[in-house]
Amino acid sequence: MNYLPIFIDIKQKPCLVVGGGDIAYRKINFLLKAHGQVTCIAKSSCKNVVKLASDNKIIYFEKSFEASDIKEQVLIVSATDNTSLNKQVSELSNQNNIPVNVVDSPDLCTFIMPSIVDRSPIVIAISSAGKAPVLARLIRAKLESTLPHAYGKLAELAGNFRDKVKEKFSNIEDRRYFWEKTFSGIIAEKVFSGKIQEAKADLQVQLDGSTKTQVGEVYLVGGGPGDPDLLTFKALRLMQQADVVLYDRLVSNGVMGLVRRDAQLIYVGKERDNHVVPQGDINQLLVNLAKQGRRVCRLKGGDPFIFGRGGEEIETLAENGISFQVVPGITAASGCSTYSGIPLTHRDYSQSCRFVTGHLKDGSMNLPWHELSVEQQTIVFYMALNGARHLSEQLITHGMSPDMPVALVEKGTTPEQKVYTTTLKKLPDLVKNEIIHAPTLIIIGEVVTLREKLNWFDAKLASSKKSYLFGG
């Protein structure tokens, strides 16, 4: 280890930055975040540094650096492109035992500034000892994507209870166990979702040692259209901490591969007219599992609030006083159209887009066909594969051109994606003659013609058999 990683308190203490360019500006902001009193010396400065000075956030001297400028400083940063000046600042700082950092010159530094992940009061510093700063920034980016921004609030909550916990548990091992349970459980998740007061109350109950079973929480998570890379950070985090996962047929294998390894998996798959577990039973199962104190992830394909019956499920949770979170997912219409090179709206072809279910609650397709048949719009049908003939006939009957372009996207966003293009008139024959598997989305509109020009995903697939043209 070439450097000792330490954190220095510079609150209200004088810090000097030599230089006024963009890099100096970044270093000044770094020092200001730690509440240092910053003085900047430069013969000329960028507009951002000048603004900091005009806002009285720093002291600014537009002049050349002099040896006397380092007097009474507790920390110095030199951020200029003048090699001899940087060396002078370093030597003077060393002679006066003042910590100094010279940007991009590790040999002239007595300390280096790491990349940081700021979740104050939690701060993570990453350093490559000046060897590979770009790599340090990449590592920082990975950490930024995995650590919830509310970690700081969790630390503050813990700080408020620290003395109480110390008083309750004299043994350090008992305290450690208490905090580990807190930081990895429902209390932490409530903080992350902004329910600070609930988390505070639950922490007090846990500290009091109540024997009452703590009610768990349900996470209604949108698993997206199939590609696991399209999951949100929050979705992934909740999937990996849930005790139980209820999932359905539309969740891809790639997404399922990311759930917590030891979680209990319950399949509640749904197919047309064949629900493995009836919706009412799913609703009640969510309630029962949460009342057992378990963290329950209800994992759905696409977005839970777009033809996903998510509203019905959380209605039941709300009626039973169960805490829940809803995490949006990329809906199939957005994911499948994007991965097929078909924009849902376009200035020249479509000024609106409608998402329509082809499988209504009563099993019929009682839709406003006149509204759906107007020009300059895109229609996306979910769950309509078996009703393709009916929707084709109805749209043509109500005025849509029989030659209107149509695309069917099977298993969209996955390596198994297939895209069939045809016309509205020929759609029934396509579905009849080809072996097309659910989940398949039907996109109708002039925007489909753009696929030939804008298709990008199929070109990345190894096989050329992923795209099909039916009926010329």
Curated annotation (Swiss-Prot):
This is Siroheme synthase. NAD(+) binds at residues 22-23, 43-44. It comes from Ruthia magnifica subsp. Calyptogena magnifica. Residues 1-203 are annotated as: Precorrin-2 dehydrogenase /sirohydrochlorin ferrochelatase. Residues 216-472 are annotated as: Uroporphyrinogen-III C-methyltransferase. S-adenosyl-L-methionine binds at residues 225, 301-303, 306, 331-332, 383, 412. HAMAP family: Siroheme_synth. Keywords: Cobalamin biosynthesis, Lyase, Methyltransferase, Multifunctional enzyme, NAD, Oxidoreductase, Phosphoprotein, Porphyrin biosynthesis, S-adenosyl-L-methionine, Transferase. PROSITE patterns: SUMT_2. The gene is cysG.
